[in-house]
Structures are given as structure tokens and as C-alpha cells.
């Protein structure tokens, strides 16, 4: 089974990232997970959690925290440039960066890879695989907009975490679930019936 890469950067919106992992695993998907160096601090400040850096300990952390046994979860360090997912020969269904910081987005847009997240995104673009980027920034400046345009021209999908009020959400969880489905539906990984 081809995996889905989830990358979490240091932008705000850790709740969406957590729910994404949970929903994919509950739907028996194979997930390759990369957290950027900055995302650990965001997780601590937004969610009050200390995520282990070591991949095996991190996998067990997520299994326990999200209370999910199904699916396959493989965790990678942000600086592991020799990871299998850094190569085009590692087949995936696609990659979702949620949330995506503007620094990460800018480096991907310019083909500059400092870490495993940026390298994987570059691989997805060069291999013509689905790359879905969920930038979490407001307001946007012209540099942000130009970088988003460059990625859209390179056929990345730009899916900001924008709520849909027409669904009449009753809770924050309803809003988060809508965003998660929006991110992963195009990969055939999850739909509203899976929640």
C-alpha cells in the first residue's frame, strides 16, 4: 500500500495536524510522518505536549495519544536526509504539509531543501505526485502570494485551513474535520463518510 506523507511545520494549527494523523490511521492508511524542528515547540505551546524526537518513541506516542491501533505509521526525523521518503523511488499517494509555515513554503517554491520536509516536497513535484500545502498565515504579503503562485504553477494544490460556514459547524472539532476532509479527499484517503 502506498503511503501518504504528512509533514507538520512550525506554523500554528497543531490540532488540524493531529486530527489528520488520527483520521488517516483510523481509515487504515499508511502514513509517513515528518515534524519540522520548529513544530515541537508549537506542539508544546499550543497543545501542551512533548513529542519525542526519536522515530520509534514518536510512533508509540502518537498511537497512545490518538488511541488508534489501525493503519501503518512511520515517523522520520526532520534532518534524516537518507530516509527512503527522500527518494523518488519511494512511491506515495501524495504529500500534505499541514500546517505549512511561510518559510517552508518559500523554500519549496524556490527548490531549496534544508530538511526532509522540503526534500520530500521537491520529490513530489519532480515526480508529478500530489503535493497539498496548507499555509497557515494571515495577512499575506506579496512575497507569500508570489511563492504560493509559483507552487500552484508547479501543480501543487494550495488548501488553506479555511472553515466552511455553510456546513453549520457546532464545535471546533466540526471545523477541523471539514478541513481534514478537504485536505485528504483528493488523495482518495478520506471523505465525510469516514468521520
Task: Report each predicted region and the residues it spans.
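N-terminal phosphate-binding or glycine-rich loops at protein starts, especially the Walker A/P-loop
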Residues: 2-39
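Buried hydrophobic positions in well-ordered alpha/beta secondary-structure cores of metabolic enzymes
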Residues: 10-13, 96, 151, 183
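N-terminal beta-loop-helix "entrance" segment that forms/cooperates
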Residues: 37-60
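A short helix-to-beta-strand connector/capping loop
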Residues: 68-75, 154-156
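Helix-loop-strand module that forms the ligand-binding subsite of alpha/beta enzymes
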Residues: 74-146
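Short, glycine-/small-residue-rich phosphate/pyrophosphate-handling segment
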Residues: 126-179
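Short, hydrophobic alpha-helical segments
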Residues: 184-191
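Conserved small/polar residues in nucleotide/adenosyl-binding loops
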Residues: 193-195
Amino acid at each position: 500500500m502506498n503511503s501518504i506523507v504528512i509533514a507538520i511545520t512550525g506554523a500554528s494549527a497543531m490540532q488540524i495536524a493531529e486530527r489528520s494523523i488520527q483520521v488517516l490511521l483510523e481509515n487504515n492508511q499508511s502514513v509517513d510522518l515528518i515534524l519540522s524542528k520548529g513544530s515541537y515547540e508549537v506542539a508544546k505551546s499550543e497543545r501542551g505536549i512533548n513529542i519525542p524526537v526519536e522515530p520509534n518513541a514518536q510512533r508509540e506516542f502518537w498511537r497512545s495519544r490518538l488511541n488508534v491501533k489501525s493503519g501503518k505509521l512511520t515517523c522520520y526525523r526532520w534532518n534524516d536526509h537518507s530516509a527512503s521518503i527522500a527518494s523518488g523511488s519511494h512511491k506515495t499517494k501524495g504529500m500534505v504539509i499541514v500546517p505549512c509555515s511561510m518559510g517552508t513554503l518559500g523554500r519549496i517554491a524556490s527548490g531549496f531543501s534544508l530538511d526532509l520536509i522540503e526534500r520530500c516536497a521537491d520529490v513530489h513535484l519532480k515526480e508529478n505526485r500530489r503535493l497539498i500545502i496548507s499555509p497557515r498565515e494571515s495577512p499575506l504579503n506579496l512575497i507569500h502570494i508570489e511563492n504560493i503562485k509559483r507552487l500552484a504553477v508547479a501543480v501543487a494544490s494550495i488548501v488553506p485551513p479555511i472553515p466552511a460556514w455553510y456546513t453549520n459547524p457546532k464545535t471546533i472539532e466540526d471545523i477541523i474535520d471539514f478541513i481534514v476532509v478537504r485536505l485528504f479527499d483528493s488523495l482518495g484517503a478520506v471523505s465525510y463518510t469516514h468521520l
